[in-house]
Amino acid sequence: FIGTITQFVGTAVANFDNSDAGMVTCEGEELSLNNGSYIFTPGGTVATIDFGSSVAWAVAGKGSVPPINYTYSRAVPQIGALDAESSVSTASDLTFGIDYTNSFTAAGSADSVLYYVHGPGGSIHKTVAASVRTVTFTKSEMSAVGTGAGYLQAAAYNYTVQNYNGYKVAFVNEGVFTKGVTLE
């Protein structure tokens, strides 16, 4: 076992009610239209989008989608680790949270955190304010995820909604950390 490896991968997704909105870029990187959604896929010559303290979006506009140029001036939250064990009992309460002592964690820009427990039997989740440092899933809730290989996940996010002549657009910055666990 070599321990935890933290790797940040910056990607972007946009959807305009499955409409073609023309060219869409995030931080200058063009997104590809695929099955109604625009997606930046890391790889090739650009391995990641490097997000800073703001995120710039440009949408050419087409049909019912207006042209949009917007810089969302909040940082994407970063999670470097979770404060959780690698073996988790489904027969008792589980409390875990973001490891705020980890040097890679920079989640101060988050408004909320969505916590998940995923297992072979199902998934459970809770959303809390970013100021809440841990979340507890009860023994009763844990019984729904089953036993075996699973993972814990935290998604810290912030968002704003902008209006373009009646066309509302939500801009969401989200940082996610996933930890593989054994559910016993």
Show where each model-derived region lies.
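Solvent-exposed N-terminal domain segments of exported/luminal and surface proteins
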Residues: 1-50
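Short helix-loop boundary/capping segments
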Residues: 79-139
